[in-house]
Amino acid sequence: MKIFVGNVDGADTTPEELAALFAPYGTVMSCAVMKQFAFVHMRENAGALRAIEALHGHELRPGRALVVEMSRPRPLNTWKIFVGNVSAACTSQELRSLFERRGRVIECDVVKDYAFVHMEKEADAKAAIAQLNGKEVKGKRINVELSTKGQKKGPGLAVQSGDKTKKPGAGDTAFPGTGGFSATFDYQQAFGNSTGGFDGQARQPTPPFFGRDRSPLRRSPPRASYVAPLTAQPATYRAQPSVSLGAAYRAQPSASLGVGYRTQPMTAQAASYRAQPSVSLGAPYRGQLASPSSQSAAASSLGPYGGAQPSASALSSYGGQAAAASSLNSYGAQGSSLASYGNQPSSYGAQAASSYGVRAAASSYNTQGAASSLGSYGAQAASYGAQSAASSLAYGAQAASYNAQPSASYNAQSAPYAAQQAASYSSQPAAYVAQPATAAAYASQPAAYAAQATTPMAGSYGAQPVVQTQLNSYGAQASMGLSGSYGAQSAAAATGSYGAAAAYGAQPSATLAAPHRTQSSASLAASYAAQQHPQAAASYRGQPGNAYDGAGQPSAAYLSMSQGAVANANSTPPPYERTRLSPPRASYDDPYKKAVAMSKRYGSDRRLAELSDYRRLSESQLSFRRSPTKSSLDYRRLPDAHSDYARYSGSYNDYLRAAQMHSGYQRRM
């Protein structure tokens, strides 16, 4: 017969001692001492009953009365009570005796500063919670409430594995007051934040990707540039759609971009420019004005070239755009509404007085007086965009288009290009004439001005007959009489001419530092001479940002600088300067192929400690190179073309063994 002996201190009670206690009442078969109780098996039932009668309440140790009773099978369901804020001085036996006054305690376990007490009956558990919650035990007020698990299942009612995924809040059939999920530990009730005694609240379901969502890519705050207040962003960007910049440039508020960017007038010249049948200008430029009617007529009637441009502003380039418009990439990169010559919001007309014509009476192309007799580009009667048809058939006022100009258009100008005064093209200081002949003339540019059909237009842009000595056009004027003319001037005399510049549109941003006529240096190396090859610009639209509208800085700033300084100012500085600690360039005599080295450099995913310079101190000289790599993004510097490790290894050889390896060893930074 199995006898339960409770209130036993298992630390100082041995099974032999307990067996000797029960031996006088019968044969003791076995004795097992647990932490706080013991089991004694006796052969005879009568002896067991006598032992229970005699030993119940016996003090085996002073102050510890034994609880001796017939052993009963563990109840299938016990009520689990959570006891929080338990003092470290409180033992499990003391806590058990505290709860046993309210009912039978099946189990009592103290875990650090909290405990779990299992009681047999629900009524006893509720009574114990009501009476003991907030009671001070050993100097601490204990927090007593029903555990979130609520009811402990016996072995016959073991929780099925599928119940672990049971919906929160489904409820427990045996104890409806608690939530249906079974959490190992309730944070709310453990820290005393529970609101009710038995209304165990189901914890909210975990967000689906909580464990994954700690990625810095998704959790970090957005970049400051994206969340800048609307007022901090330039109105240029504020009004633009994300894909096309064209329509936005036309709709930009005039407050941010100045007068020059206000919507252009819709004039006959604008329509004629867009509708030109020219081979080169027709296709790319005709389709670039999405909605010409949207241009307001409030701007001046200067036409496409000079639409509402500030007359005497020191605009730095072709585009003549204000400094605030530096965001406009280039002639060609601008959106569809800005790409064409005729549709530029501010162009030839906005150049300062020191432009091509250098006319005191006219500050720029567009603002030249109609009485001016100079036939040069800058001194035409009115301007490209706004000249009347009766004037010297200038750019904007030609009969139908570039191709359809009458042959007398340029010839009829009162003074040919070559006959201009000392300020003409050929005699300008550091003017087009001084430029080298590297760039092709206008006529040879693909899809540029010079690509216009040559036959129907004697006075057309690109292919005017060379016979006419009156500077028939920009592109193909006779080379001998007009060394400073725009187009087909001889390479020696007019290499810097309009045509030799590889088209305005094809110039990179760093080349057109100064206005065409007002460059102060005697050498134009930093100007037209440094322009890209004409094939680099198939048309205006394909250009990278050039100085005409990308720089947007007033020409006065450029005029005060030398050409070299301007080129340095416009060129991008190198990303970093090589020092002794810079990573070596990949050598050509590397036994490992350069592609392999590059793939290792780009494909490796090493931690910062492995990237640092002290990897060179490793015992194995090539261990880092031969180590396997992982594939992930690499944000280190690009591989260099040459190795300069050997150049720096001389001072290291005395005390750094790793520096003696061959020069192709890749030091990773």
Curated annotation (Swiss-Prot):
One of its GO terms (cellular component) is nucleus. The modification N6-acetyllysine is found at K164. Residues 307-354 are annotated as: TRBP-interacting domain. Residues 287-303 have a biased composition (Low complexity). It comes from the Eukaryota. GO terms for molecular function: RNA binding. The modification Phosphoserine is found at residues 161, 220, 242, 244, 256, 272, 280, 520, 523, 527, 562, 582, 618, 620, 623, 627, 643, 649. Its main location: nucleus. It is found in: Nucleus; Nucleus, Nucleolus; Cytoplasm. Pfam families: RRM_1. Residues 147-175, 193-232, 284-303, 566-592 are annotated as: Disordered. There is a cross-link at K126, K135, K138, K149, K153, K164, K600 (Glycyl lysine isopeptide (Lys-Gly) (interchain with G-Cter in SUMO2)). Residues 1-73, 79-149 form the RRM domain. PANTHER family: SERINE/ARGININE RICH SPLICING FACTOR. Interacts with NCOA6, CITED1 and XRCC5/KU86. Interacts with SS18. Interacts with STIL and interferes with its interaction with CPAP. Interacts with gamma-tubulin. Part of the HDP-RNP complex composed of at least HEXIM1, PRKDC, XRCC5, XRCC6, paraspeckle proteins (SFPQ, NONO, PSPC1, RBM14, and MATR3) and NEAT1 RNA. This is RNA-binding protein 14. It comes from Pongo abelii (Sumatran orangutan). The gene is RBM14.
